[in-house]
Amino acid sequence: MRTKTLEQNTAQDFAGLQIDQLSKLRNGNITFEQVKWFNNLTFEQREALMGKQPEMVLFLKLLSGAETLMLDALDGTETLATAKEVFPSGIDGDFKNWGTNKSSIATKEQAVEVHELVKDGTFAQMFGSLGTDLDKWCLTQAQIKNFCKKYPNWLRKDGYVTFFLFKVEDHFFVARVRVRSGGLGVDVGGFGGGVVWGSDVLPRVVVPQQVA
């Protein structure tokens, strides 16, 4: 089956719009003068009449670009609560207190991206700006550990934070990794809530790379 071009689809949509207008004219729902009046409006006048289209708010800027950051295939058994060799500077006790110390699924090799926060925002705004299906932006705890081992140079330095979204059962959490003088440290936060993270210190966000 031949795929329609963008021009063909646009022409088809435009033809459908014309047919709809003619049908409404014929049925007396609108007048020719009304159609002519609307068609002669400027772009600004139409926006004032119908309301502006909502602008997409950008919270994140891609840093890794063309870099290939590939996580290993993993069995999913490793958790952050027990990863002392990777996080010698400290592991938040809430990983255990909140019941996150659970194995996950096995994963194949996975490419990831590193983003930088460029607009103050909550976790919901950060990750939601990438797409509404949050499951797509989750890494397993084993993958988060693997990233920190393989690519420590991509973590935000100077004690500032890098965020990783993960899921345990039906609950979303955010692992927060910091590079400290004594090595890496990690704590955990809930995904919800209204805490706004400042973009002035340029926190980073690591997510799975999506196949186009």
Residue ranges of model-derived segments:
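A binding-site-centric feature that preferentially detects glycan-recognition modules on secreted/surface proteins
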Residues: 1-137, 142-212
